[in-house]
Amino acid sequence: STRCQGRGASCRKTMYNCCSGSCNRGRCG
């Protein structure tokens, strides 16, 4: 998984969010 900082940070693709330091599809939690 791609690392990222903060929450809801836009990752390389749309509909990806920053959750627990990694880019995940959809919403966090």
Swiss-Prot record:
Compartment annotation: Secreted
Signal peptide start-end: none
One function term, GO molecular function aspect: calcium channel regulator activity
Entry keyword Disulfide bond: yes
Matching InterPro entries: Conotoxin_omega-typ_CS
Cystine pairs: 4-19, 11-23, 18-28
Cysteine amide: residues carrying this PTM: 28
Propiece residue ranges: 1-3
Keyword list, A-Z: Amidation, Calcium channel impairing toxin, Disulfide bond, Ion channel impairing toxin, Knottin, Neurotoxin, Presynaptic neurotoxin, Secreted, Toxin, Voltage-gated calcium channel impairing toxin
GO cellular-component term (any): host cell presynaptic membrane
Tissue: Expressed by the venom duct.
Its job: Omega-conotoxins act at presynaptic membranes, they bind and block voltage-gated calcium channels (Cav). This toxin blocks channels of the N-type as well as other types.
Domain description: The presence of a 'disulfide through disulfide knot' structurally defines this protein as a knottin.
Family as reported in the entry's similarity comment: Belongs to the conotoxin O1 superfamily.
The protein's name in its UniProt record: Omega-conotoxin MVIID
Species in which this protein is naturally found: Conus magus (Magical cone)
